[in-house]
Amino acid sequence: LFNEDNELIKKKIENLNNKIMILLCVGESKEENKKGITKDILKDQLEVIKNLDLDESFTVAYEPVWAIGSGLTPEPKDINEIHKYIKDVVQSNSVNNLLPSVLYGGSVTDKNAGSFFNEEFVDGALVGGASLDGSTFAKIVNIFNKTKEL
């Protein structure tokens, strides 16, 4: 979006770590998804955290670019698999073996949130357009709370 390379993103994370909650958004394009190289793309994007001592508030949002605002979402089992992969990559690459929270963002609505909130490795959602309507956003929050039994 801003044409930031991994080196610049890594410097930003290093400078902001322990000062604010960092939310790193990663995701693949429709073409990359169709080619079956999603994990390769995510691994490359997650290189920015290699050898960093991450704060426990560090969070990753998986946002498949092809799903944002499209009304399309991956299957819940696929979202879960990708979230597990992201957690594994971050944990193995950070100095302190941090197991991050991973949020899903990509056409999140009150109609589909429950399907992926039920998945083991989905820790929450990064809600875009649906957050503009307070009642819809409240429904998503309630679905999350019921699903995750907070």
Please give the residue ranges for each predicted region.
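Active-site loop-to-helix "anion-binding N-cap" substructures in soluble metabolic enzymes
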Residues: 1-150
